A protein has these predicted regions:
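Mg2+-dependent phosphoryl-transfer enzymes with acidic/Ser/Thr/Gly-rich catalytic loops
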Residues: 44-126
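Conserved acidic, metal-coordinating active-site core of Asp-based
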Residues: 1-73
Length: 126
């Protein structure tokens, strides 16, 4: 089909292989691409400007919510653009170092418990 490709994900548990794949793809494509690693096995390739941050801001615009009024929760490198784009970036306790570096709040819990903690604290005020 004549449909544009927006995202490609490769999976390999070996970080050195993932770095090699990233380097080879970025060397061979003739357009701007963002590449991120996530979940200790994925290499994600998106067109520049196609990321969770842009999607979050677009949804906010659609709903009439300003970026500084948005809370985003993340845990991995592919969440960094989203975390950078919002007013309250939150990560769970087992988040990657780069995600944590872009957070204003690090939840004490992992995954679901961390998300519940953030919602209780910042949305419900408990």
């Amino acid at each position: 089909k004549d449909e544009p490709i927006f995202k490609i994900i490769t999976m390999n548990p070996d970080f050195n292989k993932r770095k090699q794949i990233k380097a080879e793809v970025l060397d061979k494509v003739n357009f701007d691409v963002n590449a991120t690693f996530s979940s200790d096995r994925y290499t994600e390739f998106n067109l520049k400007g196609v990321d969770k941050g842009q999607a979050t801001l677009e949804l906010g615009r659609h709903l009439g919510i300003k970026a500084d009024e948005i809370m985003a929760l993340g845990d991995n490198n592919n969440d960094v653009a989203m975390l950078k784009s919002v007013g309250l970036p939150v990560v769970v306790s087992n988040a990657s170092a780069s995600a944590k570096a872009n957070a204003k709040y690090i939840a004490k819990g992992n995954y679901e418990t961390g998300v519940a903690e953030a919602i209780n604290k910042f949305v419900l005020g408990e």
